[in-house]
Amino acid sequence: MASLALTSPPSVKIPSYLSSSSSSLFSRSSISFRTTESRSRICVSGYAKCNLPKALNGNARVPIINETTIPKFFDSSRLEKSVSRNNTKLKLFSGTANPALSQEIAWYMGLELGKVSIKRFADGEIYVQLKESVRGCDVFLVQPTCTPTNENLMELLIMVDACRRASAKKVTAVIPYFGYARADRKTQGRESIAAKLVANLITEAGADRVLACDLHSGQSMGYFDIPVDHVYCQPVILDYLASKSISSEDLVVVSPDVGGVARARAFAKKLSDAPLAIVDKRRHGHNVAEVMNLIGDVKGKVAVMVDDIIDTAGTIVKGAALLHEEGAREVYACCTHAVFSPPAIERLSSGLLQEVIVTNTLPVAEKNYFPQLTILSVANLLGETIWRVHDDSSVSSIFL
């Protein structure tokens, strides 16, 4: 019987790609941190802005993010005091899907991960045992339902059930990547709406609330009969783009398909109301996309393609090829969830994309690293959201 025990060491080391000396492969968000000697909440102290050195090709370099577009991560003295006196009513546990992200969240919050033993039996069954009391506690379980999707989903359900049976006061499922989110409607006869089924399973297991990052479609929130906090990862990516010193006059935001226009429009609005272009495509099968034509002007521009998921990368790469054909100077791909199913890496590293910017909502295997890849951490965003949910404070104000 294989086993995996997830515990927190007495002191948490900051991951290398969160430090100021991060490698070129792992470029973190330009959010900076301040810490104190005692274990306390880590707070955001500022954001990097575009420098204003001199004009480039006749266009002044101006910040593409201003003070009104930056989320105000608030300092709560009450919460900090709570942590400093070892608040036992807030518990954070990690599943096995993305323990690195869970540890970063705990580091941001000034907490230690709860102790839990997760085992795999020889026949594939999953066993979960909490190694500390959660009676009367506000419990948050961090577990993206990424590959292997069914196994990680089942693990989450069993963790929720274990917390409920251990008399936790509230159980929140923190799902950075929500598997089956793309199965949110019927496109052909006799199909299942698996996203609704998964929502039912999580609810019936005993979860009181769900936190999810950049759901494929907004209507998925309505599939749950419990509250859902939709965490938008745009601030992390926007902050990183601000550090690129791209002239706002040279920028165009591109939606890789018609279905993502609303997402791209919201993204463009934050980039000084950058112009919008749309790639029109026709899908002939699952994981197969064909680019048809481009709506909008990208000639001589820096094109930023915005999507929620990169799976096989067919949509992104074919879109990038079309943008180059239409005269785009550079093409960037910005995506929250890096699924990277084969042959995604071969396509993304082919040279069509200047940079592929993703987040760590699900782990990226080392074998899938390539020179153009940049991974940003959403730990701050999730940690702040968890604090606000625990404190009964506004979550939506983070993204306004």
From Swiss-Prot:
UniProt xrefs under PROSITE patterns: PRPP_SYNTHASE (PS00114)
Keywords: ATP-binding, Chloroplast, Kinase, Magnesium, Metal-binding, Nucleotide biosynthesis, Nucleotide-binding, Plastid, Transferase, Transit peptide
Compartments reported by the entry: Plastid, Chloroplast
Enzyme class at the top of the EC tree: transferase
Stretches the record annotates as Binding of phosphoribosylpyrophosphate: 300-315
Family: Belongs to the ribose-phosphate pyrophosphokinase family.
Protein name (database record): Ribose-phosphate pyrophosphokinase 2, chloroplastic
Organism encoding this protein: Arabidopsis thaliana (Mouse-ear cress)
